[in-house]
Amino acid sequence: MKLLLYLFGVTFHSNTVVALELRECSHQLGMSNRKIRDEQISASSSFDLQSTGPQHARAHQESGSGAWCPKNQINSLSKEWLQISFSVDTVITSVETQGRFDDGRGMEYATAFKIQYWRPSLNAWASYKDDFELETIPANNDTEHAIRRHLDRAIIARRIRIVPVSNSTRTVCMRVEVFGCPFDDSLVFYNVDQGDLQSGISYHDFSYDGNLANSPHLTGGIGKLYDGEVGKNNVFVNHHKWVGWRRKRNGNVKLAFEFSELRNISGILIHTSNEFKKSAKAFSSATVLFSINGKDFSDTIVHFNNPEDTESEVPRWIRIPVNNRIAKVAKIRLNFGTDSDWLFISEVNFESNHTNIELLNDDVVIPDSVSYFSVTEHDDGTSMFAFIIFFFMFLIVAVIILTVLYRKREYRVKASSPSPNAKREILLTIDGNTIKHHVSPSTYQMARDNLQNALIEKMPMSPIISDYAEPDISVCSDVTANTPLLYGIDGPYDTQKRSNPLSSMVKYSDYGEVYCTTLPEIARDKLICVSRIGQGEFGEVDLCQLENRKVAVKKLHGISQADEFSFHREIRVLGSLKHPNVVEVVGVCTIQKPILCIMEYMENGDLKSYILKNPTIQTSQCISICTQLAAGLAYLESCNFVHRDIAARNCLVDGEGNVKIADFGMARSLYSQEYYKVEGKFVLPIRWMAWEALLLGKFSTASDVWGFGVTMWEIFSLCSEKPYSDMTDDDVVENLQSMSSTGSLKQVLSRPRMCPSKLYNEQILPCWNYESSRRPSFENVHLHLQSLVHTSPHIHF
């Protein structure tokens, strides 16, 4: 029975990603606000414990004589330290220091310091090193002002020591604050061979904090491969975040990861380079072994082959799928690419969740793939009777599980944070512009990558500003009021209750707080306006510069309190969506009016305009675009979000050729001819709408699939005409009414010339099935499109 309970837990426990997540790990840890208690602060010595003891080392606070002052003067070899102890392992991302001001009487400050840290898994204190392998960190130039230093890599510590140093002997006093967050992951350490040197450049894992001992093998610590930082392009120049190995005699690199608890692992993600022109390809294959105790490894081994990519040299995440393996230790062997002299890795993450070990006895064998049960026969037959009961209970539970999974297929709850993007990219060039092929296993899961959400513009904005449509993703729950949107539909519906299903008031009304997120508050003076992009549903949309990136800024002003509430709900819902093929909300400005929503800027504008400006686009590019959109829509599907207005005009293209799902209030004015005006009140995209959405007001992921079928037709038609271009709006409505009454359309969109017959018949046509349950899921559409990416040059028409 415990094994059954265990199986239940494995089946329904959502996967999380074991990774060092730094985007929201910069909180003040409590020196200034006294969340860190006096008893958690200690020091090697104090000039006077009462007036300059460690309890006075709080930044932005004046107590005692104003700071901690060690008993001895400081030089470059000093060993004085201030120690902060935490109750749990903690991620430290930055340190702030001040001197002793003491209302102007102080004269002492530290010009530099070092960091030492410890946690229970380490045998000794470790020293922090920056990207240049230096331990010394610059500190203060006066006694009053605080200086905050961001660490080049985060450290994981239970105790941290601030060690003041100086080139000349001097008296020093310090106040400090530390920033970071609790360490919630379960990785204890990883073991790996030390990296190699190339022409004096080190590709060592120099931040590794375990047992070094001048050995070529690193054990018992954590370093670059688990610091939340991924490497940049051109590993031979931007080498600081990479660990690199030359091809050895055996041609592989071995890694071992140990967790503090049993984990149910479903995937391993490895960030690797692929600079094949410099003989630094991604790994060609991988082998993974698992153990529940670190000693005995399962005979069931995971083998993974990574297809060689000779098109793109961009670093990428590669996902190794693992079929729910229970393990405390995972050993990974990566084989060098063909004719590759180097292998570079910058980060390793795990898709996994906690396994409740209390359900497992020592004598319960956790199955690798097939479980074998044996029963010892007793004279009284009791054991056989128990076995029969157990067997039938197992069958009943299995049927229940399968039934629930089937029912949850269409009505999934909002997914947990998806895993980092495991995409492969194949660059396709169209008259100097670039679109990316994305080929990724289980892309619908991979929202977190995004991983660093890098949104830096790489191409100048088109001079035709009307081509840019405001990102405003319209999403809505399946649970909608089934009210017809047109007059003349039978049923007891109050016509006064008809409302625009594309408005923010309606489309976000079904989302409770569970779907919302708290977005970063961005200082208004950080935004430098570049130009006006256009007009959105709530106000103007401007192109602005935010530090080193360009962003699209939506303004809200001069509207009702209800619209302001809708705007707040919209941006909070949108902020919860994180996927490489969904336009991202960067932050908000809400402290002053007008309220601003800062969104990712997509410099190549909407997909329809982009395709129209590139008439030489080929079938392979069309398949790539559809694959990317299907990935984003599969993610929305997994979150149970409904878009309601999927069309080429509502997708955007960034400077690198990434195509992303969006929905623009502005698109309805840019492409007003593609919308049908209902009673002079609102407009509907009837040529993209499923029959049940238009006639019954039923919006679901299945109605989105219908719209995506029309969108694929658009893409393969090169957006040269609108759907059903030979029909009036009334004819289109009549066509959908025909499906409602007869189960079939009078007229179906014909296969575009550039669309392969197989794709049209097997992927596009099924999107327009009368029964929504017979339409494919976005997950299945995405998987089928991915399979075509590899064969697109050989597709027959």
Curated annotation (Swiss-Prot):
- According to UniProt, the name of this protein is Discoidin domain-containing receptor tyrosine kinase B
This entry carries the following GO cellular component terms, namely: axon; perikaryon; plasma membrane; receptor complex
Q: What is the effect of changing N167A?
A: Partially impairs axon regeneration following axon injury
* Annotated region (Disordered), positions in chain: 46-66
Q: Which organism is it from?
A: Caenorhabditis elegans
What effect does gene inactivation have here? Answer: Viable. Normal morphology of D-type motor neurons, but 24 hours following injury of D-type motor neurons there is reduced axon regeneration. Double knockout with ddr-1 results in a more enhanced axon regeneration defect of D-type motor neurons as compared to the svh-4 and ddr-1 single mutants.
The record's Pfam families line, in alphabetical order, gives:
DDR1-2_DS-like, F5_F8_type_C, PK_Tyr_Ser-Thr
Quaternary data: Interacts with shc-1.
Show the coiled coil region(s): none
